[in-house]
């Protein structure tokens, strides 16, 4: 019985000690602050960084991307794996080098997908759509057709 009581006390102590840490690393929905998405994405989307530095040299990141109805991202690849969870709305995803709406699959809220490095894919939002993306820094978009890259030319 002493061992069980000790285990309970130790667990409670660890839980209490972790509370400040959890509070510093957690966000209620109203605490997520969106701003303009980076220029390598088409205009109109908003982005919130939850964890890490997506543009940093290396490391994990977690972001949320809010897209308006009809928002489209042309076929592209990433050098690292990308994990995507649909939080609201509908994300349509297609595979290949050409944007073809007839070949897209719709994923509603609660859906999860992961895209392996260098996988050719494209996406569109149906209704306002929010996705959470987790991956490795730095985020890079390699558009299949360079003319589709919305990044301002220097």
What are these regions (language model features)?
Residues 7-18:
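Bacterial N-terminal signal peptides
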Residues 25, 102, 124-154:
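Double-stranded beta-helix
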Residues 73-75, 93-94, 115, 120-126:
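Short beta-strand His + acidic residue motifs that chelate non-heme Fe in jelly-roll/DSBH
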Residues 53-55, 68, 97-118:
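Short acidic-glycine-tyrosine-enriched beta hairpin
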Residues 1-7:
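Positively charged n-region of N-terminal signal peptides that target proteins for export
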Residues 68-71, 78-98:
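Glycine- and acidic-residue-biased ligand/ion/polar-headgroup-sensing regions
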Residues 41, 54-60, 74-85:
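His-enriched metal-coordination microenvironments in redox/metal-binding proteins
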Residues 20-59, 146-154:
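A short, N-terminal "cap"/entry segment at the start of jelly-roll beta-barrel domains
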């Amino acid at each position: 019985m002493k061992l069980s009581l000790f285990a309970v006390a130790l667990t409670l102590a660890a839980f209490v000690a972790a509370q400040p840490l959890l509070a510093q690393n957690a966000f209620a929905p109203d605490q997520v602050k969106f701003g303009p998405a980076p220029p390598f994405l088409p205009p109109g989307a908003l982005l919130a960084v939850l964890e890490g530095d997506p543009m940093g040299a290396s490391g994990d990141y977690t972001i949320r991307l809010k897209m308006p109805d009809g928002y489209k991202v042309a076929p592209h690849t990433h050098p690292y794996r990308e994990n995507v969870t649909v939080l609201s709305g509908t994300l349509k995803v297609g595979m290949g080098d050409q944007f073809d709406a007839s070949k897209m699959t719709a994923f509603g809220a609660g859906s999860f997908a992961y895209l392996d490095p260098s996988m050719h894919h494209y996406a569109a939002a149906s209704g306002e759509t929010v996705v959470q993306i987790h991956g490795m820094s730095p985020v890079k978009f390699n558009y299949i057709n360079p003319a589709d890259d919305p990044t301002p030319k220097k």
